[in-house]
Amino acid sequence: MDLASEITSATQTSSLCSSGRGHAGYPAPGIVAHGFETHGTARVAQGHLLPPCLLPPPQMPVLAALRDLSRRGSTSSSRSPSRPVSTSASKPCLPASCLGETWSISINLVGSSGHLQSPGAQRDAQRETGCLGPSWLPHHQGRDEELSLSHSAQGEEF
């Protein structure tokens, strides 16, 4: 009797979790009201089903890996595999609200690192070519003092 009630309460809580709507939660109090034993098993079944629904352990390594990739600067290679990884990690048995939160977090990490680092690297490359290209030609013809001043100014800029 206990196993059967535990299985039915477990299937109802899992259907509630997979659908993300409260309609599947209404039959659960009817099962709990049958007796004290079913109330205890329903509480145990819900306790066992809550960690897979929230998914705290798989999400944290994914976010940490995204941060490590964004720090290294390889945003072009990390942008394409990060979206399938985040969807596959958040698909099993998540409510709609949790799914939206984890999806927006992964997009924000990838989007911010991609937009901040790749144009920044291009701007640094343009600065080097723009400053060094014209500035070397006149300074070789001019004085050595101007050359040393340009070196100190470039050191402060970077």
Swiss-Prot record:
Compositionally biased tracts (Low complexity): 72-90
Start and end residues of each stretch annotated as Disordered: 1-20, 66-94, 111-158
Record's signal peptide: none
Biased composition (Polar residues): 1-18, 111-120, 149-158
Protein name in the entry: Putative uncharacterized protein MRGPRG-AS1
Organism of provenance: Homo sapiens
Taxon lineage: Eukaryota, Metazoa, Chordata, Craniata, Vertebrata
Name of the gene encoding the protein in the UniProt record: MRGPRG-AS1
